[in-house]
């Protein structure tokens, strides 16, 4: 009983210590908290975000998010965190949901977390605005269907080296990124882990610990030949006396051959089946073989260990900066926190509560769309040539019975039956 009380208290302490730096579920006042960027507005290529639950959803109000539109536009919008997030010694959890309702064929669906140092640029927040974290799905055709995890280190952006597959259907999915003070990370989709590992191993933020010695050179006596000619092998006697071609003994002088006019007839030459080509000694394993020479590793003088790769001290904004050929993605339920369990609970209370109803409505809408397409579809085209061939098999015959014109197969008419 005591242990149970302790466990409950521990859970409460953890919950109490967790902090949400940003939480957005997109109600009717969402536009008061978000700033549309002026990026791309002047040239007319900037798109808009509108509040909607889309064509299918679990709850018409709770599932409202912001949707991109129209097609082939750039989209940029941002909002400030409640307070600047210094993640020193804390987990960093970035979570949001996205529904590619339009069956996205090419476009981004990722979120950016932006540092306070970019504050003066947020009015024109766009592709060149420095950010700290970029996370989420990116889809373009069949070649690009990945989850980006890009981290900024000392002013440079580094892409994750792992290939994480993005969800590509038309339903809502929750993407969660966790960065920990021990320099490890997790990526979850729909609260299931799809990737994890080390910031040191899965990004190239630091140079390698060791490098090949640039001053090293291959020793002169280093033998890289895996095989050598057998020094004991000898060329058979008479090998070089065998000609490459010989006269064709089966050839016959043509009957019309005139030696005086055509010259002395000689049979044509053909390849000699006994000829074996240039003699070469057989190859044997080289007893002196040492393998391919590789320069030895040495400590990299440029390597400096950093135990704070995870560390972002001034996270201040979240934003979407996207290009979409086919618009219609709906973003919702954004959370920046320092506690994964709090993020999971938030996802369960939002997406998790309505996902089954959304799927059911999606199936219903798709079924109705398919039925309408089938109903509105034009009849299959008539093969005019085939129809004409069929008609040619018959001829009109007038019968005295008063039944009018009937068609009788040609072959029956031409068979010449006598009337009884």
From Swiss-Prot:
Signal peptide: 1-18
Region (4 X approximate repeats): 194-259
Keyword terms, alphabetized: Calcium, Chaperone, Disulfide bond, Endoplasmic reticulum, Lectin, Metal-binding, Repeat, Signal, Zinc
Disulfide bonds: 106-140
SUPFAM superfamilies named among the record's database cross-references: Concanavalin A-like lectins/glucanases, P-domain of calnexin/calreticulin
Chain location of the short sequence motif Prevents secretion from ER per the record: 417-420
Compositionally skewed regions (Basic and acidic residues) per UniProt: 210-220, 357-376
Tree of life domain: Eukaryota
Major place of residence: endoplasmic reticulum
Region (3 X approximate repeats): 263-301
Subcellular location: Endoplasmic reticulum lumen
Region (Disordered): 210-272, 357-420
Biased composition (Acidic residues): 221-230, 385-398, 411-420
Listed InterPro entries: Calret/calnex, Calret/calnex_CS, Calreticulin, Calreticulin/calnexin_P_dom_sf, ConA-like_dom_sf
Name of a matching Pfam family: Calreticulin
Mapped Sequence repeat ranges: 194-205, 213-224, 230-241, 248-259, 263-273, 277-287, 291-301
Recorded family membership: Belongs to the calreticulin family.
Biological role: Molecular calcium-binding chaperone promoting folding, oligomeric assembly and quality control in the ER via the calreticulin/calnexin cycle. This lectin may interact transiently with almost all of the monoglucosylated glycoproteins that are synthesized in the ER.
PANTHER family, sorted: CALRETICULIN, CALRETICULIN AND CALNEXIN
Name of the protein described by the UniProt record: Calreticulin
Organism (species): Chlamydomonas reinhardtii (Chlamydomonas smithii)
Lineage, uppermost ranks: Eukaryota, Viridiplantae, Chlorophyta, core chlorophytes, Chlorophyceae
């Amino acid at each position: 009983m005591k242990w149970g009380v302790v466990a409950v208290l521990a859970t409460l302490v953890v919950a109490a210590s967790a902090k949400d730096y940003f939480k957005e579920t997109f109600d009717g006042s969402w536009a008061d908290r978000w700033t549309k960027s002026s990026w791309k507005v002047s040239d007319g290529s900037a798109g808009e975000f509108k509040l909607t639950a889309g064509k299918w959803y679990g709850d018409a109000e709770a599932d409202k998010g912001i949707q991109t539109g129209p097609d082939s536009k750039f989209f940029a919008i941002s909002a400030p965190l409640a307070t600047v997030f210094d993640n020193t010694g804390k987990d960093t959890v970035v979570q949001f949901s996205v529904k590619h309702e339009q069956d996205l064929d090419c476009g981004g669906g990722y979120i950016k977390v932006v540092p306070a140092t970019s504050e003066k640029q947020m009015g024109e927040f766009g592709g060149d605005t420095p950010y700290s974290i970029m996370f989420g799905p990116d889809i373009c055709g069949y070649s690009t269907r990945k989850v980006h995890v890009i981290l900024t280190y000392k002013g440079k952006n580094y892409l994750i080296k792992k290939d994480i597959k993005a969800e590509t259907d038309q339903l809502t999915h929750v993407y969660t990124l966790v960065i920990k003070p021990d320099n490890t990370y997790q990526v979850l989709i729909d609260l299931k882990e799809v990737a994890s590992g080390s910031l040191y191993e899965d990004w190239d933020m630091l140079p390698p610990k060791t490098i090949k010695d640039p001053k090293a050179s291959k020793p002169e006596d280093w033998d890289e030949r895996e095989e050598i000619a057998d020094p004991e092998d000898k060329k058979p006697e008479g090998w070089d006396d065998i000609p490459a071609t010989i006269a064709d003994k089966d050839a016959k002088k043509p009957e019309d051959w005139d030696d005086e006019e055509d010259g002395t007839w000689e049979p044509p030459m053909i390849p000699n089946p006994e000829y074996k080509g240039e003699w070469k000694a057989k190859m044997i394993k080289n007893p002196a073989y040492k393998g391919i020479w590789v320069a030895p590793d040495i400590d990299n003088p440029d390597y400096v260990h950093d135990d704070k790769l995870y560390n972002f001290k001034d996270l201040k904004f979240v934003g979407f900066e996207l290009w979409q050929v086919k618009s219609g993605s709906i973003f919702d339920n954004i959370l920046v926190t320092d506690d994964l369990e709090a993020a999971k609970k938030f996802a369960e209370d939002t997406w998790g509560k309505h996902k089954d109803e959304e799927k059911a409505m999606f199936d219903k809408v798709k079924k109705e769309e398919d039925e309408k397409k089938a109903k509105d579809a034009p009849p299959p085209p008539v093969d005019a040539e085939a129809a004409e061939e069929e008609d040619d098999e018959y001829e009109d015959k007038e019968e005295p019975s008063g039944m009018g014109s009937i068609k009788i197969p040609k072959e029956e008419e031409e068979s010449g039956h006598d009337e009884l």
